[in-house]
Amino acid sequence: MLIFNTFNQYLKYKYIKMSKYLVAYFSLAGDNYNVGVVKVGNTQLLAEHISNYLKADQFHIVGDNNYPPKYGDRIKQANKEKSQNFRPKLISQVNNFAQYETIFLGYPIWYSRPPMAVYTFLESYDFSGKNVYLFCTHEGSGQAGTFSHIKGLLPKAKVSTDGLVMQGAHARTPAAKQEAENWIKRLNC
């Protein structure tokens, strides 16, 4: 039986006992290609399936660069950010990133790459020795070589290129949850 002398000791114990898994993802609600206006983005739906299955902590990667509400305008901004190699500031940070052994990283494919806020996230933390599993949503491009690309950006991490790739519209179906769970089982995490 554990006995705590102060409430702060209890909180510290509880915080240290958090999940060893972190599901970090970039996803946008609103006007999405091929699915219309949605309250929850396609990649977030996959992230929720993964984190619920693993009982993992979640971190929504959000940059300080607001995107316009219309899909066409969003894509123009995303392309401009990519061509300028722009790094938006993240509006929040992961507390105690070092505690996580395994990171699941999710993102949509925009112009054959993740959104630029994902690069900011990757550059903001030390991934040395961490297991990294990638998942993405797309509307026809597949993962577009991003798994190998991210593996190259994280040479000190153990990045698996056996990622989960799903069309955004399919991420909204009941089958998506089972496919995400089957992927995690196959990874043997």
Name each region found by the language model.
Residues 11-102, 112, 119, 178-189:
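N-terminal beta1-alpha1-beta2 submodule of the flavodoxin-like/Rossmannoid cofactor-binding fold
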Residues 159-189:
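Glycine-rich phosphate/pyrophosphate-binding loop and the adjoining helix
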Residues 140-153:
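Glycine-rich, charge-decorated loop segments at or immediately adjacent to ligand/cofactor-binding or catalytic sites
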Residues 114-118, 143-146, 176:
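Residues at alpha-helix caps and immediate loop-helix transition turns in enzyme cores, especially N-
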Residues 97, 123-129, 154-156:
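Short, conserved loop/helix-junction motifs that constitute active-site signature segments
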Residues 28-31, 64-66, 109-113, 138-142, ...:
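Solvent-exposed loop/turn segments at secondary-structure junctions
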